[in-house]
Amino acid sequence: FSDSLLAIARAGAGVNNIPLEACAQEGIVVFNTPGANANGVKELVLAGLFLASRDIVGGIEWCKANKEDANIAKSAEKAKKAFAGCEIKGKKLGVVGLGAIGAEVANTAIALGMEVYGYDPYISVNAAWRLSRDVKHTTSLDTICQECDYITLHVPAVDSTKGMINKDALDQMKDGVVILNFARDILVNEDDLAEALKSGKVKKYVTDFANPKSVNLENTIVIPHLGASTGESEDNCAKMAVQEIMDYLENG
């Protein structure tokens, strides 16, 4: 590090790409920007919910593949049966992690008519105030696994959460469950998940993390880390980071 470096601001919530121990040894303060990109990620999670429930992508690809068919309108009426899905209204959604993003996902899912369960043993007072009173708070991940049709992950990548979705957790889940991971890829044991996808235990896996394993999983929608890839999210993160640095330099 340069001797003049006093602080580092990370434009995002995760700080796993910053050498925290080295910074601490040098007295360099590290900031992140939690919540600045929450709306952008929330909207992509909702898109994932819809993509997993309705085979929209399959239908679009069918149209592209049959664009030379002069009778495509008639053909589509027969073909569309293969892309039938289900509605999310009335389904049970389990939100694991009720920070800024998880709370927004939970509240919006309530507004869409879903029955929402929330699990977060470390929920803050501010996060609790943001959460709809209609969210059913549970103290056990097991309850989420056993009760929910959809499970979405919104926890940080730490030792206690690495591989939290493993064979034991998957075995407790409903047949045909949908799992969404827009937090960190290492939260899911992808070897165990591969078996659950193959057997049909997990109907669909939606992830915002492309890696050599995820892109080869069956019944999986892989998105190239687009959660915060909006102009609004980038602006919000930059503004928060600048404000944090200025406040530290001016006030300590």
Region locations from a protein language model:
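An N-terminal-biased, well-structured beta-alpha scaffold segment characteristic
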Residues: 1-32, 146, 166, 189
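Short beta->alpha connector loops at strand-helix junctions that form conserved
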Residues: 11-12, 27-39, 183, 225-227
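Phosphate-binding beta-alpha-beta segment of Rossmann-like dinucleotide-binding domains, i.e.
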Residues: 34-92
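Glycine-rich Rossmann-fold phosphate-binding loop(s) that bind the pyrophosphate
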Residues: 98-99
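N-terminal Rossmann-fold NAD(P) dinucleotide-binding loop
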Residues: 102-103
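Rossmann-like adenosine-cofactor binding region
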Residues: 117, 121-213, 229
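NAD(P)-dependent dehydrogenase/reductase Rossmann-like domain
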Residues: 215, 227-252
